[in-house]
Amino acid sequence: MNHQIHIHDSDIAFPCAPGQSVLDAALQAGIELPYSCRKGSCGNCASALLDGNITSFNGMAVRSELCTSEQVLLCGCTAASDIRIQPSSFRRLDPEARKRFTAKVYSNTLAAPDVSLLRLRLPVGKRAKFEAGQYLLIHLDDGESRSYSMANPPHESDGITLHVRHVPGGRFSTIVQQLKSGDTLEIELPFGSIALKPDDTRPLICVAGGTGFAPIKSVLDDLAKRKVQRDITLIWGARNPSGLYLPSAIDKWRKTWPQFRYIAAITDLGNVPADAHAGRVDDALRTHFGNLHDHVVHCCGSPSLVQSVRTAASDMGLLAQNFHADVFATSPTGSH
């Protein structure tokens, strides 16, 4: 039996089927709620539950330390009755926005010893409609899929650029190293909610770990295209300098924004350049900033990295609603 999900202070209601998460039900109904990892790690989908009952979805936690006493994780629960929720934001999706394409490999190069820079081209006359920071699914022949963030900005819509880290034993990590020009992949996009607002002028701190740089590159290239002027800092962390694999992007942003600040964070303490921070990205945040009350932080990386940065930012006065996360969480259906 389906139950109805009502969004507080709106006329929006949608059905939630048995065995379906509230988040999936919303997306199926064309309603976008904040989300990223869909595995309970990022906390983006936390929403107040005002009325009704829920149960766990597929054994997932319905709450985490990121939730207030009133909140539940919409990716981790299903409706056990009609419920009323109050998400931090919502919007109606364009039902025609999400598309599936057969994309061709245009080029496949190594950006770092363990990172492939994969450029895809869409069929002639087709364009990918997405927003900076969103991700796509790569559908594999066996029915599984893997998710990766678009690294190119939305105005470069005739193709897609992905940054793929080679994970030992990873399903797509093995495939990507064998792909050559002309090979095809089935892709579907876009996925993911957008937290950053292009018209926001508050100081922005972007924090990335490894290939968490990909969605941040899309965001910053988009802001540059829009000629947005704001104080922007990028903290990019890797084990060694080779993991900071796209210095040309940094150089371009320095020319775009004279006030742009870049902090490289290297954890291999025996291999730290003179101009880099020795340590983790959360350590770099604490070292180079004071009070963050008036800032916005956008963090992309592993669950542990995101959590450590979230804790540091909170300790430094950042308001919870000004921390936006894109968690690269490994799952049965893939990871960014």
UniProtKB/Swiss-Prot annotation:
Its cofactor is FAD; [2Fe-2S] cluster. The keyword Cell division does not apply. [2Fe-2S] cluster binds at C37, C42, C45, C75. One of its GO terms (biological process) is phthalate metabolic process. Optimum temperature is 30 degrees Celsius. Approximately 60% of maximum TPADO activity is observed at 15 degrees Celsius, and activity is completely lost at 50 degrees Celsius. Keywords: 2Fe-2S, Dioxygenase, FAD, Flavoprotein, Iron, Iron-sulfur, Metal-binding, NAD, Oxidoreductase. Binds 1 FAD per subunit. Binds 1 [2Fe-2S] cluster per subunit. It comes from the Bacteria. Residues 98-197 form the FAD-binding FR-type domain. Its EC number is 1.14.12.15. One of its GO terms (molecular function) is NADPH binding. The keyword Calcium does not apply. It holds the Pfam family NAD_binding_1. It catalyses: terephthalate + NADH + O2 + H(+) = (3S,4R)-3,4-dihydroxycyclohexa-1,5-diene-1,4-dicarboxylate + NAD(+). Residues 3-91 form the 2Fe-2S ferredoxin-type domain. PANTHER family: NADH OXIDOREDUCTASE HCR, PROTEIN RFBI. Monomer. Part of a multicomponent enzyme system composed of a reductase (TphA1I or TphA1II) and a two-subunit oxygenase component (TphA2I or TphA2II and TphA3I or TphA3II). Component of the terephthalate 1,2-dioxygenase multicomponent enzyme system which catalyzes the dioxygenation of terephthalate (TER/TPA) to 1,2-dihydroxy-3,5-cyclohexadiene-1,4-dicarboxylic acid (DCD). TphA1 probably reduces TphA2A3. It can also use 2,5-dicarboxypyridine (PDC) and 1,4-napthalenedicarboxylic acid (NDC) as substrates, and preferentially uses NADPH which is the physiological electron donor. This is Terephthalate 1,2-dioxygenase, reductase component 1.
